Amino acid sequence: METDKTTYLRKIPARRSDSNKGTYGKILVAAGSEGMCGAAYLAGLAAYRSGAGLVRILTPQSNRLIVQSLLPEAIFTGYDTDSNFRVLSEANVSWADIVVLGPGLGTEALSVTLVRELLQTIAAQCDIAMDGNGVLRSEAEGAEEDTEKSPESEDSAPSAKNRLASEHPESSEKMRSKWLRKCPLLLIDADGLNILSARPELMQLVDHIAARIPVVVTPHPMEMARLSAASLQEILQCPAHAAEALAEAHGTVTVMKGSETIVLDADGHAFQNPEASPALSKGGSGDVLSGAIAGVYAVLRADRIDALNEGTAEEQRTLWRRMAFDATVTGVLLHAEAGRQAARIHGTHGVLARETADMLGIVMQK
């Protein structure tokens, strides 16, 4: 298992002199619940501090005042029990390049509805732009009807796909080009994972998506136990085995969080953070990590976008998957170092998650 952090930290590019906010991605953070708006704020703050161009926070309407006061740079989109979650999901997923789903979301019925609609919309957009085998469509292939069915539920992904396709009638080549420019990523954390673990049909949707675009999951040991057949004790004894099994079963980049966090993907890449950062053992640190990974992905994407538009479809997908792994490892390393740097100011016992987030940009600059 790889442990050389310099390999990844050297891959952080300088910010392009000709860039604008769109260059560095549009990140949708679907997070927070009533009484837990901090998770949405921390993930959004970390995304901005690690390089993201635009962040939109999708959270209950009751969180508006606090979130907009703490992070006025973020776009706020609120919802409540009367919201049309289908329309809400389609509008926000269409806007975003990167989706962070789950921090502080809760597992109540409203949160489950939001997760279901977001996953169905992402799956539908994947199917419009890609064929049934997860290969980017060509012009000729796009003329044919895609007959593959994704997992069924009350409002299945295929029906969402047909609706979106009829509302956005573009040539398949244009859709393919837009898809490559977006290079979308889905990251699922915290209550997003807890909702999946209790609903196999939603986990099947994630499998469907992961066969088409990179999906990152970031469980801690208890969340991993809920997602897998392994017990908590087995996971603690051999976290790498649990992470490898989840990555292979679902095609994800899997982050097994711990004192020495492990990152594995379905292509066989594996990395272990060689240096613990005890200052991170505080509430909100996982939310910061999710935002950091998303922000780093946006930065790497801006640097590698030209290479991603060259070569065969399979070569493009290989680069795309590798970029997701690189961004995840780099995010883990930056997060750990930011915690250590924050501890120099506030002490190891005294670091708050937002202070770790605030150090991300400084660590990246170094």
Spell out what each predicted region is:
Residues 1-22:
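Positively charged, low-complexity intrinsically disordered leader regions
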Residues 1-5, 58-275, 310-319, 365:
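Glycine-rich phosphate/dinucleotide-binding loop and adjoining beta-alpha-beta core of small-molecule
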Residues 16-23, 34-36, 277-293, 320, ...:
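Short glycine/threonine-rich catalytic loop with a Thr-x-Gly-x-Asp
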Residues 20-75, 81-83:
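Substrate-binding N-lobe of the ribokinase-like
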Residues 21-29, 267-279:
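Glycine/charged-rich beta-loop-alpha catalytic/anionic-binding loops adjacent to active sites
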Residues 35-50, 56, 108-111, 193-197, ...:
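Short glycine/serine/threonine-rich phosphate/pyrophosphate-binding segments
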Residues 226, 282-317, 323, 328-333:
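Short, small-residue alpha-helix embedded
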Residues 336-366:
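Charged C-terminal helix
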